Regions:
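Short glycine/proline-enriched coil/turn segments at helix->beta-strand junctions
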Residues: 28-32, 74, 92-96
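Structural signal for conserved beta-strand scaffold positions within catalytic alpha/beta enzyme cores
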Residues: 35, 80, 98-101
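Conserved active-site segments centered on acidic
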Residues: 1-69
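Phosphate-binding/catalytic loops
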Residues: 86-135
Length: 135
């Protein structure tokens, strides 16, 4: 049996979806994981990298990636982190998507990004439990 693949998507793939990918990789060994965006940035948000390091998860090797049809087709479950603009919203391109509607960390203070990180961690751990119960 092929390992189920989980895909986290947002617009820039520089913050929220990268946090989710980092937590998911750390806590879910029965699944593959990746993240992508419809308009990916060239690098990760440095504050996001910093707040993930604070909890012992190094995401410096993760890179923003362009969302592709293959990623969507290969995904067992796709999670949209939320949209900062409707024209580029990944949920427009994915039929079966779970939308978490999480605030974008772009331009936020480190304290605000920590709260976003913690919210994403809670959502990821809840998702892992549900997925493990389903397989």
């Amino acid at each position: 049996m092929q390992t189920p693949h989980v895909l986290f998507v947002c617009v820039e793939n520089a913050g929220r979806s990268q946090i989710a990918e980092g937590f998911f990789r750390e806590h879910a060994n029965k699944f593959e994981v990746t993240s992508a965006g419809t308009e990916p940035k060239s690098e990760l948000n440095p504050i996001v990298v910093k707040v993930m390091n604070e909890v012992g998860i190094d995401i410096t090797n993760q890179k923003p990636k362009l969302l592709s049809n293959k990623m969507i087709q290969d995904s067992f479950r796709t999670i949209n982190m939320g949209c900062m603009n409707k024209e580029s919203c990944p949920s427009l391109f994915v039929n079966d998507v779970l939308d978490w509607n999480i605030t974008d960390p772009k331009g936020k203070t480190i304290e605000e990004v920590r709260k976003i990180r913690d919210q994403i961690k809670f959502e990821v751990l809840s998702l892992i439990k549900k997925l493990e119960d389903d397989i």
